[in-house]
């Protein structure tokens, strides 16, 4: 099994991005699966262009995109990506699309095809906080998740794809009182646990367990 893992460069005034730092620490093989990690720019269309190049060349069985969600307390596999860019801040090249479809020929939304509840369970087993998230936002993270599912559907129809948000690193919150953060090694362990579940559930349906929210 081959798994493509992506991590964004820093954005929004941050000097580092835990997504990129964490995937740099991943081993080349996890649970027998070959792991390929790539950096993607925090730029709307350009991130998808980079992803497409690697999907076409690597032909992965699964794509896991990782992104920073400052303020979240745990690792959060995303359930759904919507076909809408609505940028609160500009991306790293100054683009700020407002109420713009990501793909005019795409679906209104794509659900993750990764075993998100099994991923949460595996992260819990590693002793780390995790939960299913029902919104990936409307910035580049949602954009890339949507594009990943669109591109996999087009170029690797038998592959799975999805996204997981991670918290700030400890170094990012020294001047942000009362802001949640996690040690980089723990973030990396959480991603490894999630990948273990992706491999383990390659030919199985996801766990059927409570993971919803009331609001």
Swiss-Prot record:
Chief location category: cytoplasm
Kindly list the GO molecular function terms attached to this UniProt entry. pyroglutamyl-peptidase activity
Q: Which reaction does it catalyse?
A: Release of an N-terminal pyroglutamyl group from a polypeptide, the second amino acid generally not being Pro
Keyword hit for Hydrolase: yes
Can you supply a Gene Ontology BP term from the record? proteolysis
The places in or outside the cell where this protein is found are: Cytoplasm
- EC number(s) stated in the UniProt entry for this protein: 3.4.19.3
Gene Ontology CC terms, in alphabetical order: cytosol
State the active site: 78, 141, 165
- Pfam families to which the protein is assigned, alphabetical: Peptidase_C15 (PF01470)
What keywords are annotated for this sequence in UniProt?
A: Cytoplasm, Hydrolase, Protease, Thiol protease
- What is the protein's known function? Removes 5-oxoproline from various penultimate amino acid residues except L-proline.
> Record's family?
Belongs to the peptidase C15 family.
- What quaternary structure, including any partners, is listed in this protein's UniProt entry? Homotetramer.
PANTHER family, sorted:
PROTEASE FAMILY C15 PYROGLUTAMYL-PEPTIDASE I-RELATED, PYROGLUTAMYL-PEPTIDASE I
Q: What is the official name of this protein in its record?
A: Pyrrolidone-carboxylate peptidase
Gene coding for it: pcp
């Amino acid at each position: 099994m081959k798994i493509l893992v992506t991590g964004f460069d820093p954005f929004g005034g941050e000097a580092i991005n835990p997504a990129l730092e964490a995937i740099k620490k991943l081993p080349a093989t996890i649970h027998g699966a070959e792991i390929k990690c790539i950096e993607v720019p925090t730029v709307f269309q350009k991130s998808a262009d980079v992803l497409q190049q690697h999907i076409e060349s690597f032909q992965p069985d699964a794509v896991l995109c990782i992104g920073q969600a400052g303020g979240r307390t745990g690792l959060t596999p995303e359930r759904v990506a919507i076909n809408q860019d609505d940028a609160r801040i500009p991306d790293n090249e100054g683009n700020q699309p407002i109420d713009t479809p990501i793909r005019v020929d795409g679906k209104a939304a794509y659900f993750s095809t990764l075993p998100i509840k099994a991923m949460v369970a595996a992260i819990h087993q590693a002793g780390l906080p995790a939960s299913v998230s029902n919104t990936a936002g409307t910035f580049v993270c949602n954009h890339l998740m949507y594009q990943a599912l669109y591109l996999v559907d087009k170029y690797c129809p038998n592959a799975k794809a999805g996204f997981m948000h991670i918290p700030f690193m400890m170094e990012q919150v020294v001047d942000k009182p009362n802001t949640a953060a996690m040690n980089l090694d723990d973030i990396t362990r959480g991603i490894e646990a999630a990948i273990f579940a992706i491999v383990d559930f390659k030919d199985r349906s996801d766990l059927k367990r409570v993971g919803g929210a009331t609001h």
